[in-house]
Amino acid sequence: MVFVECGAALKLNQCIYIGIASTICLLITQKANAQEKPVNTKNIGLITNIPRLSDIERPPTSVKDWLSQSAPTPPKIKITGVRINRTDDNFEIILETPDGEISAPETLQEGNIFIADIPNAVLALPEGKEFREDTPVDGISYVTVTQQESNNTVRVTIASSGKLPPIQVVNQSNGLTIALTPTSPDIELIVTAQKRPEDAQDVPLSLTVIPQQEIEDAQIRSFQDIANNTPNFSFLPTTAGSADFSYYSVRGLNNFNFLANQDTVGFYIDDVPFDYGGFLDVGLIDLERVEVLRGPQSTLYGRSSPAGVVNVISRPPSNQPEMRISALYGSYNNRELQLSLSDAIIPDKLAFRLAGAYNARDGVFDNTFLNKPIGERSQLTGRAQILWTPTPEWNISFNAYASDNDNGNPTFSRQNAENPFQVSQEVDGFHRLSTNTQALKISYNGDGFRATSITTRRFSNQNTLVGDNFPGDLLQQIIGINSTLWSQEFRLQSPESADRLRWLLGGYYESRNFNVLDDTFKYSDAGAVFFGLPASGSDRVSAEQNRHTYAIFGQIDYKPIAPLTLFAGWRYETADAELDRRRVFVNPDGTANPPTAEVRNATLNSDAFIPRFGLQYRFNPNLMAYATIAKGYRPSGFNYRADTEDTRRFQEETTWTYEAGLKSSWLDDRLSANLSIFQSDVDNYQVLLTDDFGFFRNVTNANVKVTGLEFELKANPLQGLDLIAGIGYVDSKFKNYRNSFTNRDFSNNRVPFAPELTYNLAVQYRSPGGIFARAELRGYGITYFDDANQVKQDPYALVNARIGYEGEKYGIYLYANNLFDTRYITSGFLFPPPNVTAGFGDPVTYGVRVSASF
């Protein structure tokens, strides 16, 4: 391939251009003889195109056959019961009869449908009912057992949401058993990244999917855990145990500019957009899967996201009684309890699901000044879901969830400290965050089209007190912020059965009220002297920002020939922003100086047309190539901390990303390997600047160029043995960037919080006897934490391990994280210059976890 041939001789960005051009040439010359793997998840109309076994034309019978047919017909066998038996490895459909063995059925498999017709049988269930169960296990849409009156047969129908797993039919002494063993990972990798159900290997973009079983095995409970299992995605807390703010980066673009109005990455939980990086510390519980889309996503999602999307999908309400519980205890008095339960209120019509979690941990830092541990944390999370399905075409769901975080002071140390977890500071601070969310989703899935409406409200409230982390108490920072976000998204799109032409049209509205109630630096007498102030006191800023965003978006996918798909998408977005802001200095006696730099009703508007183009070509059912060109966009905004008009506004940011990739699967889907290469050119990247004392007060714009690649591999070489690996490389550098306040030139410096290398490797084994073992390696390349590239973390790697025993309905596990107690920093800054003050990651931790399901 051209990717290998050009690697030694050319730079990565040159490889990208050659790769895209070669891919297009290869696609044009390839024969049109491959078909895309079919995926169908609709619960109605699936059997209409499958001929009845009795309707298939049979050859004329012979005299011998005619004579044999004249013999007395044996009595019909009554099927008096249908049971579903679930285990960790498979599930069984058991047909019970008091009359003895059931005749061997005729079977037919068509796409994702399996049919078994049992001759000379009658369905005699209580009250004469037929049997149906929706979603009996993950990956199976429904199971039905019905009477076929025309030919005295009983039909069993199994519909899979993806590829059918292996199915075995076994006659028993008192009935018939149909057993399904989902050994292929495809059954778990049906995704909705493009707002339609499809195999992850058919999606023409760089995509990481973490299915439910992997979520449990890797113990994914936060966005940081998701990033640890995703190439070119880093998610770093400010310091160990901290939840006040987390720095993330996808493909070299980060959220370091926390004064910006919109994040670079779109975070969604059950279709609800999250509005600010400081509000992302939510517990992720009772999940079905996670999808991480890298690259600009503006033509299929309500909110425009220039770097990518993290899409979290919770487990939906079940039509059958279900209960799960898990508990954990570990180092630093770490304790966790999770509970979820689900059942039908009205069978097949109305169901509910409840989930909740509590976790808490003592601080990992020892404060010798106060003689107590600090940096403790606690979190309480709850979620409630109601799902109403009045007809097979309609789904109406209401979700509500809330979280409450009460954490200790974010604690920092000198980067070169002998023991960074031992500090001496006077202030015992805190960080408190509470959020609540409500969402109403109405979906129609018809034969001619699909329609979706999503209405959401999200409220967040944050209060923080932070000391300077050193003896002497020079200053304290006090922050009080709340945010209310309303959004409405509507989508109209082609039906799931559409193949040659697929289309989507959507609209989006968002209203966000962001209130800075208090952003204060409180200086002591010593602090006033150190920072050159005339007297001690509190420098207080308050502000209110309102933003209204309107957008229309859409995409068309067209197949001119069977293996080739061309797609084009577009988005038009406009946003209006308004700012009120005041700054006062409050003296120690409580009197306030006259306000300075007061702003009222400042307004700005920005708009953009955002296109996306691409193609994909399926060489055969196991190999697909794609190439895309996409624009990303972040609107202009206000910096509420700025004192002057020329620094108060920053410009809109645009990104052009060029990407080419290959997706492949081998050995009956037991091995998958995906590769993508990309280049992003960013104009007016929104950059956060510090003043002479290291405080973040200003925002400017700079140009950035990013090149990189991602490679992911999953393998199941032996039954029970799984290998998961991923690696991402990114070269993200400033271009033509000079700090206008200090006149320092940062051109060709690396963008902060964007590790050059990210990698993850997991090897796990689950034995038939119940033994479970898993080892993980995750690492980062060199990472800088400032534009000047003066504060950095050298490459490092962490090792995690788990071992346990699993029964049919329970499990008990021992775990160790950061097994070799590696020291590393997750943030850093010059304070007071030239000293480096840093936040350190968690030390080694151990613990035990138990889980059970009912």
Curated annotation (Swiss-Prot):
Induction data: Expression is significantly up-regulated by nitrogen starvation after 24 hours. Constitutively expressed. Expression is very slightly increased by transferring cells into a medium lacking iron or copper.
All residue ranges annotated as the TBDR plug domain in the record: 199-315
First-listed, main subcellular location of the protein, grouped into a coarse class: membrane
Keyword Ion transport: yes
GO biological process assignments: cellular response to copper ion; cellular response to nitrogen starvation; copper ion transmembrane transport; iron ion transmembrane transport
Role summary: Involved in the TonB-dependent uptake of copper and iron under conditions in which the concentration of copper exceeds that of the iron.
Protein family per UniProt: Belongs to the TonB-dependent receptor family.
Protein name (record): Iron and copper transporter IacT
Species, as recorded: Nostoc sp. (strain PCC 7120 / SAG 25.82 / UTEX 2576)
